[in-house]
Amino acid sequence: MSRTIAAALAVAALAVGTATAAPAASGLSPTFTTCRDKAQGAVEQAACLTSESARQDQRLNQAYRQLQAKLSGAKKTKLVNAQRAWLQSRSRDGELDTALYDDSQPGNLQGELNDVMRLSARADQLQKYLQLLD
C-alpha cells in the first residue's frame, strides 16, 4: 500500500514539475504542450517526451549547421569546441539524473523531461547566436 501511495505522489510531483518546468525553454513546441496536457498516464507522457526530444534535437542541429555555415576560422573552431563541451555536459547531467531519480516511471519521465529541456535550452542559445550574426 505504501508503494502505491509513493508512486501516486511521485506521479503527482512529476505532473507539477512538468507544468512548472516546461516554460523555462522558450523553444518547446505547442504540440508538446498540447500532448502533455492531454496525456493520460506514463506511456502517453513518454510518447510526448520522445516526440519533443526528436523535435528539439532537429531544431538544435539545424541551428548548429546554420551557425557553422556563417562562421569561419577561429570562431568556427570555438563553436565546435563549445558544442563538444555541451554534449559532454549533457551526457554528465543525464548520468546525474539517472543517479538521483529512481528507476520508476516517474523518475524515468523526469529524466527524459530534463533532457528535453537541455536540448531546447541549447537550441534557444544557438538561435540567439544566429540572431547576433544576422
Residue ranges, per PLM feature:
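Bacterial N-terminal signal peptides
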Residues: 7-17
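N-terminal alpha-helical modules
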Residues: 2-4, 20-134
